[in-house]
Regions:
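A short, compositionally biased micro-patch
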Residues: 38, 64, 87, 94-95, ...
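A short, N-terminal "cap"/entry segment at the start of jelly-roll beta-barrel domains
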Residues: 1-36, 136-141
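Short beta-strand His + acidic residue motifs that chelate non-heme Fe in jelly-roll/DSBH
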Residues: 45, 71-72, 92-94, 99-104, ...
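Short acidic-glycine-tyrosine-enriched beta hairpin
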Residues: 75-96
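Conserved short histidine dyad/triad with adjacent acidic residue
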Residues: 34-56
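Double-stranded beta-helix
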Residues: 100-141
Length: 141
């Protein structure tokens, strides 16, 4: 959180809980949950009904498949305030604010975000220069 606004949710690889837990508020445009079920537990076959939804902000979920990644957080005015380290198996949902990444080790990430992707438009993202390495403040978990 930054100034009471939830910018990201990080789930570390060693996270453990029973049953199902959602980390996101119900009104988030992207939902992130964790499930732990015993052998033999059944999730009944189902489908998701067509429901018109409005998406105003792109939210990204990144799964760190391998390596080590630094994520840098900025407020909505592009002012840097802290960084976190993500390791193999960690998951992050990027909700609001600005963010950038630096690979600390060779890394693989799987990304999930809302679509449709419109490469011809490219108005969903604005780029700016990253914070200098000597200004980085790593926040420990």
């Amino acid at each position: 959180k930054f100034k009471e606004k939830l910018l990201a949710i990080i789930i570390k690889a060693n996270y453990d809980s029973k049953g199902i837990e959602f980390f996101t508020p119900n009104d988030f445009e992207q939902q992130l949950g964790y499930m732990k079920r015993e052998k033999g537990y059944v999730i009944n076959p189902h489908f998701h009904n067509s429901i018109k939804r409005e998406v105003n902000y792109t939210k990204e979920v990144l799964f760190i498949k391998s390596g080590k990644v630094r994520v840098d957080f900025y407020d909505e005015n592009k002012i840097y305030f802290e960084s976190r380290i993500l390791n193999k198996g960690d998951v992050i949902l990027l909700a609001f604010g600005c963010h950038g990444f630096k690979m600390i080790e060779p890394s693989e990430m799987i990304e999930v975000k809302q679509g449709p992707f419109m490469p011809e438009v490219r108005t969903d993202k604005s780029l700016f220069d990253p914070i200098a390495d000597d200004k980085i403040k790593i926040k420990e978990d």
